[in-house]
């Protein structure tokens, strides 16, 4: 395993610099550099690489003076909240553009890839928490998971809901890679048994047994 900071790949800042404002397009540019092994510690790597990238630009706080670019109107929302929502939305638009550009670069490499991305947690605008939909155990942490790949696979999605704790096994299956340890075998089996749920599973005794087994 190897942990690289953006500064290790050319970002002009000291290692102790706060990176909350680094753009997601920049972060994905550094991910491309890692895949191209543009770092001395990567040049000997021959096996497939698993690269995890954390983007930060989408995180709050959000600016309360952002113009209403998206013409948002809703009863009960203050002007500050609408401004924050516009700021958040424009950051998500930029993230989407960066994501599509990165995915295009993956396709151009003509090598097998599995590209997955997911959100972190629900947002608060001007200290206003939007109402949550659905009966979830932790509604503030409901997000989306997207997987895109050029690897031929017989994998079919069985669950309409999946806990992020099961994404590792999901990616192994989609990539067609062998599951070589008991932890990941249990991870995949539990995802199937619990229909992708963990905290939200109806059978919490099964969840407790799974955790005890791990």
Q: What feature does the model see in each segment?
A:
Residues 1-214:
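Solvent-exposed soluble domains appended to multi-pass membrane proteins
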């Amino acid at each position: 395993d190897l942990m690289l900071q953006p500064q290790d790949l050319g970002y002009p800042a000291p290692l102790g610099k706060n990176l909350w404002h680094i753009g997601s397009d920049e972060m994905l540019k550094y991910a491309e550099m890692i895949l191209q092994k543009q770092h001395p510690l990567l040049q000997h790597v021959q096996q497939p690489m698993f690269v995890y990238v954390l983007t930060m630009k989408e995180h709050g706080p959000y600016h309360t003076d952002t113009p209403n670019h998206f013409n948002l109107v809703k009863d009960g929302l203050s002007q500050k909240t609408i401004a924050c929502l516009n700021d958040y939305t424009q950051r998500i638009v930029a993230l989407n553009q960066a994501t599509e550009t990165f995915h295009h670069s993956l396709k151009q490499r003509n090598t097998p890839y599995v590209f997955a991305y997911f959100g972190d947690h629900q947002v608060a605008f001007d200290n206003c928490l939007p109402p949550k939909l659905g009966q979830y155990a932790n509604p503030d942490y409901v997000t989306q998971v997207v997987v895109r790949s050029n690897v031929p696979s017989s994998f079919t999605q069985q669950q309409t809901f999946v806990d992020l704790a099961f994404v590792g096994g999901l990616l192994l299956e989609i990539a067609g890679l062998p599951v070589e340890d008991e932890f990941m075998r249990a991870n995949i089996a539990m995802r199937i048994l619990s229909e992708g749920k963990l905290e939200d599973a109806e059978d919490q005794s099964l969840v407790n047994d799974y955790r005890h087994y791990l």
